[in-house]
Amino acid sequence: MENNDNKQKKTFHYVLLVTFLIIILIGLVCVLFVFRNNLKAQNDYNSVKSSVEATTAQIENSDTDLAENPIDFDALANTNDEIYAWITIPNTNIDYPVLQSKTSDLFYIDHDVNKNYLFAGSIYSEFSNLRNFSDRDTVLYGHNMLDGSMFADLHKFEDEDFFNENKYIYIYQKNRKLTYEIVSAYNYDSRHIMNSFNFADDNVFQEYINDVMNPHSDVRNVNSDVELNLDSKLLTLSTCLNGNNDGRFLVQGVLIKDEPTY
């Protein structure tokens, strides 16, 4: 009887060990898959960036009275005609094309610039926003990736010193550069901004910009030197909260310069 008990214990321990090893193996495979996927994505984005950077010849032949545009949008259109802008934030890893699908709002939540599946997705806007940034608020979305890619670096603006020292967001389009001064950065709830507010109503928009300047959040930084009014054009960058998918972290800026580029 004792021998049977020992055999059962050994069998149980063996099964437990095998199960544990299988779980570890599956975990390692998943980590490897995510790592390779993210590495491929970063390489793809770097390749896209290098292929569409304006050449020295283009710069030298340009009208020097115009602002510099580092992106060759003609080359970018050959990659994907749903790319309509490029976003850059100094001192962050945020330096990406901006897309808007013609068929599905959520397509680029898990697809790259080449329209291939990618867990990290892309930086994108939805149908509720025009592609010319003329709306009272344009919302761009990006994942909060653990490797620091996509919109993960938005969380740097939680730090007051970083927030105060890095004030601008740059959006490039063909022959155009938009400069936004950052107004606020804060934790927000899970509401869909464009579906929750009727920005055509001046009263609604006024209340909204009041909240932008005075967010209802314990985690917030605000640039009190900026003034917003009914003519303001906002840019909202939205990503997940750290360790919490039931809310958003927002960095919001106001358009201060819209200039032609070569």
Annotate each predicted stretch with a short phrase.
Residues G27-Y262:
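Solvent-exposed, non-transmembrane regions of membrane-associated and secreted proteins
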Residues V15-F33:
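Sec-dependent N-terminal signal peptides of Gram-positive bacterial secreted proteins and lipoproteins
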Residues M1-F12:
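N-terminal Lys/Arg-rich, disordered targeting/topogenic segments
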Residues E2-N3, L17, I22, Q42, ...:
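N-terminal leader/presequence segments that precede the conserved core
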